[in-house]
Amino acid sequence: MALLITLAACAGPGPEMPGRRPPALADLPPMKTFVTHRVTPPQRSNAAIAQDFLDLAFQMESGRSLPYMTRFEGPITVRVTGPAPASLEPDLAALLARLRREAGIGIHRVAADAPASVTIEFLPRSQLQRLVPQAACFVAPRVSSWEDFRQSRRSGEVDWTTLPVRQWVAIFIPGDVSPQEVRDCLHEELAQAIGPLNDLYRLPDSVFNDDNFHTVLTGFDMLILRAYYAPELHNGTTRDEATRVLPQLLARLNPRGERIGGSDLMSPTPRAWIDAIEAALGPGTAPSQRVAAARSAVEIARTQGWRDTRLAFSLFAFGRLALGQNNGETSLAAFLEAGQIYAAHPVTRVQSAHVAMHIAAFALSAGQPDTAVLIIDDHLDDVQNGENAALLASMLLMKAEALDMLGWTKEAAAIRRDALGWARYGFGSENEVRERMAEIAWLNPARTD
């Protein structure tokens, strides 16, 4: 805490210095990828998970209610069409294997020209966003191609609330983004294509949350999907019917959740807070309006009496946006408070790491490289376990700058090279890698090259 108090006293925008010029892409190390997945079971009671399941399965992100559950019956087939990037093959194979192993879902890939339950179509990002400007990627029912979607997008055909059973759906993903962005889209959109359609900001350990902290399906997500395809539930199950079935169903699937005591049920999230967060983080809003919306989200969270992830996320969003307005002291104060909330719970270690990266950046720009190294080292394992290559690369590049400042140039060079391997997966293009490396180099107040 003393380190952070000292850091707060030094808060201010980082110096704008010319950055280190990264090597050409041909000189970069090979792309690094995550080869193993650490399964972490849910850390909440089954009573809380049952409430989460109901809110995920019987409501849309817009707030519209769904009258009953829909799901696929029988084996689920997946095909890929369009110009898919090379990174898709191992990432999709790993995801399908996890769904079979952890969620017990019979799902497998078929040829591109075969009929399939789920079509994953790749297309240029510009083409996708011409029709759906706010979407990085998305899933639609009753269509099997982009052309189908174009023709049906203003009709009831792509309305999930009118769907009696899932027979075929299509996922649309840009093929010209980083490997990590492709993988993240795969996880979130395939989970919603076959499972619940809603996202809940209150969930601390889930991809079914628009805060985007978790980018690969978690143990909680796999439990939700396993329950979604349990024999006790079926197409047409209503919310009341699911409410009666879930206690015994979850006791069977997740016996450890029966042993977790305490009241971990969370209050509903008011629409005003969601609207404020979406205004703060969505496109097409002026910077000053974004800051005001984030401040409003913080105020609503405090009024609600929250001390959970929703207040922390409000503060995190406000901290990032205030930083963009060159308000370093306000930004750091928001990050520090968000970090304290996230650090209080083991289940939010991934969120803590995101906050820590920003605090470490303040330490670096304040000329405190030893503090930056301590902060980063405390979170690297959590970032690795969360499989976020972009965040991992950023933190390692920051650590390399800090070590340079401390005179450990040989160690800094080795860590920087390791970071660039992760950057190739997390950021993709040479230009993106260059930009990120330069941004972090600018944090070093001593750098003049």
Question: PLM ranges: what are they?
Answer:
Residues 6-9:
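C-terminal motif of bacterial Sec signal peptides marking the signal peptidase cleavage site
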Residues 11-77:
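Disordered inhibitory propeptide/activation segment of secreted metzincin zinc metalloprotease zymogens
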Residues 89-193, 197-203, 312:
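Metzincin-family zinc-dependent endopeptidase catalytic domain
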Residues 269, 282-298, 325-337, 366-378, ...:
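Helix-turn-helix repeat elements of alpha-solenoid scaffolds
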Residues 306, 346-347, 387, 427:
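Structural signature of alpha-solenoid helical repeat scaffolds
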Residues 335-339, 374-381, 404-427:
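TPR/TPR-like (Sel1-like) alpha-helical repeat modules
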